């Protein structure tokens, strides 16, 4: 999950002449639009963290080729911002609950939810277009600093949870 440099190819695609999908930015002679792939790459690139944390369910990683029941997850610690960032992808057809347990923290280091960013579409093949450039964009919901023990991740959603943890190095 920590990527110091990333290259994504193909980057640009003209709407009247392209070789393959997905491309990050589509354009014609006058306009451009960010694709769904662009926003996913942006969410990862802007939330890399400094240390990778374990993300498991029932002791098994929520990663790899299989995930668990359509769930895939990663977690990182950002030492500069003093935040834990949890990213969860639910590729299944149903909403799923994810239990969040921050092992290894002192009781005084209760994680405070900062915000939740969700990226969702009911249609797996939908994308932004030149005529509708904001059909699918990340939605950010700020939080009041409350604790969050269980996250409800809708079907076909990429969700990112940022938690402030004071007193951790």
Q: Which residue stretches match the model-derived regions?
A:
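Aromatic/acidic polysaccharide-binding cleft in carbohydrate-active enzymes
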Residues: 1-75, 80-82
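Conserved, mostly hydrophobic/aromatic
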Residues: 6, 41, 86, 116, ...
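C-terminal beta-sandwich/jelly-roll accessory domains of carbohydrate-active enzymes
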Residues: 56-70, 89-169
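Short, well-ordered beta-strand segments enriched in hydrophobic/aromatic residues
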Residues: 82-90
């Amino acid at each position: 999950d920590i990527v110091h440099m990333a290259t994504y190819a193909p980057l640009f695609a003209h709407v009247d002449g392209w070789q393959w999908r997905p491309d990050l930015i589509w354009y014609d002679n006058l306009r451009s639009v960010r694709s769904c792939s662009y926003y996913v790459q942006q969410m990862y690139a802007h939330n890399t963290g400094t240390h990778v944390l374990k993300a498991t369910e029932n002791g098994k990683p929520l990663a790899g080729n299989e995930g668990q029941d359509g769930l895939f997850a990663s977690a990182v610690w950002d030492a500069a911002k003093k935040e834990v960032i949890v990213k969860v992808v639910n590729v299944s057809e149903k909403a799923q609950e994810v239990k969040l347990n921050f092992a290894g923290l002192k009781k005084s280091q209760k994680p405070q939810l900062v915000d939740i960013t969700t990226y969702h579409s009911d249609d797996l093949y939908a994308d932004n277009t030149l005529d509708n450039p904001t059909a699918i964009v990340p939605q950010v919901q700020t939080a009041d600093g409350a604790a969050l023990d269980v996250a409800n991740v809708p079907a076909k959603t990429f969700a990112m949870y940022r938690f402030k943890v004071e007193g951790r190095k």
